[in-house]
Every structure is written in structure tokens, then in C-alpha cells.
Amino acid sequence: MSTTTTTRAEYGASGTSYYTTTEKQDSYPSLENILEKHCKNDTLKACIRELLDGCADITEALRSALVTVEGTDNSFGDKQLSVDVIADNIMWDLVKSSPTIAYGASEEEPVMVKCSGSDYTVCWDPLDGSSIVDNNWAVGTIVGVWPKHTGTGEDGMLGATGRDQVCSLVALYGPRTTVIITLDDGVYEFSYGCTPEGCQLPDGSFEPWICSKIKVQIKEDSKIFSPANMRAAQDTPGYKKLLDYYMDNRYTLRYTGGLVPDVYQQFTKHMGVFTNPTSKTSPAKLRLAFEAAPFGALVEAAGGKTSDGVTGGSILDVTIKEVDQRCALAIGSANEVKRFNEMIMAK
């Protein structure tokens, strides 16, 4: 267990906190050590290294860039922020120069672009959390990696599902930069920029990336909830009933409005549920290929569960029919996603 519960009844549900009990190790495995043991495909190893280099570059850029409005709109008509453009440019530079990536698409401009590499189709959200980044809150990068031969088209995307991914990766940029990745046998977390005072490799040396968590697991039950799209509760009675259940049963609210921090916490607290149903007046906003499928692969690899919010089935089984396809989503601890299905869809 890496978290503990402290309850102060006089403060009500908000007085229930989940603190880490993770103790500092004398040394930590290197990125190369973990990849060598837990990623058999050499081409995929190279792709992961490239993606982590991109996350490192975005980290450094966020530390120095001001958050300002650019003079451009993205494909959805939203004003782009300086940090959105910087992060997306870093990802495009990486993807277009990669020997492993054959096709790429960004959430900022959801059109598949042919690249010069060999094996993979990569979709990414360069900086998830644009609406909260000006607050200096945690934001992130989401990446899904598909073989280029999946699906029905030459780019490997249309006709594919999230279950076809060979790797997914989410970076969280907060006081520290950490990245969770699906490898052959589970989910691993890597931390960036460790110092001699922080952590070191077994041989006493220091590298940009060390493995800070091995084979992360998400428990079946949770007392933490992250309710997105609460407007949907106005015309979705089941969602209002679910929110009332959380409050009546003294669940702890942990919600920032950013998909990355709100779901990533499930890998540090080892529990949680993120709910984002849709309704006629509150339509789907999450993007299947850029957000839901990559996170779904990570959560299910860690023992969690997902729901597509329509059939109650896994988000990983939804066929990608459009690059910019939107979807509902419930994701997290298995029994909590089951509760979502039961209350929202009577499944």
C-alpha cells in the first residue's frame, strides 16, 4: 500500500485525506534497465525513448514560457495558448523526425499526417488542461501508439480500437514531471530530472529518467471521486443519483478540471473514479483517440475498468470511425465503474 487514510469526523467528508506512505529508496532502476526487462520490442523501445525526450522538452518549456494567447485558433475555433503551440511544436518535431513513427495526429489539428518513420501511428494531446494552465495547475501530455497496420486504412487508425494500442503514455507536469507508460507486463512510472539529493541509480550515477513506480495497480474499490461534466446531471437523473451517492457515503472529492491530473491520481492513490457522462444538452467533449483510449489502456493494464458511457462496455472496444471522434467515459476502480454503469445506464 502506498496511501493511508486520516479521518477527522468533525470536518466531514472533506476531512478524509489520502497521504502517501511511499518511502525513499536507496536507488532506483534506470529507464534503460526497465525497458530492457519489460519491453521486448526494440522498435517500440526506441519510440518510447523519443516520446520521453519530448516530455522532457515540454517540461523545460513550461518552466520558462508565459501563458498568453496566440494569434491563432485550433481546428475547433478555440484560441491557442502559447504553451499549447510550444508543446504541439515539440511533439511534431519529434514525430516528423522519428525513424519509428509512420503517421501522426495532434488533438490540436486532428488530421492524420504521413511521416517518414516505419512502424507506428501516434495520436497525442500535446497539453491537456489548457483551461487551468494559467492557474499554474498541473497539466499533461497524452499519447497513444498504434501499429500502422491496424484498422482499415493505411494509417492504422480508422477502424482500429483502443485495444490495438501497443503503448500508451501520459505525462503529468506539476512540481515534478512524472510519466506513466504501459509496458509488456503492466504500468510503470518514470520521474524526470532527479538530483543527487533526490534519487540515484544502483551504480551511483544519475540520469534524466528513473523508474519511480513498478507495476502500478488500481484497487477495485475507491472513496475518491472526480465528477466531470456535472451539467449533464440536469437531464440525466442517474448522474445526479450517482453524485448524491458519493456525497451521502462521504467520498472524498478530488477534481481539478484537468483530465490528466484527475485520472493520473488513480495511479498514485491506487483508487479513484473519473466520470464524464453525456446528455442532450451536455454533449461529449473527450476525444477517443487522443484522450480516452490512451488513458483507458493505462487504467485497464493497472487492474481498473472503463465504460464507454453508452453500452457499458470498455472504452477500448469502441471502434475509431473518425480521428476526432468524441465519447463519454467512466474510468477507474472497477467497482466504481460498475456502479456508474448501474446508475447511469441501468446496466
Provide a role label for each language-model segment.
Residues 2-69, 79, 85-347:
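IMPase-like, lithium-sensitive Mg2+-dependent phosphomonoesterase catalytic core
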Residues 73-77:
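Short, surface-exposed loop/turn segments at secondary-structure junctions
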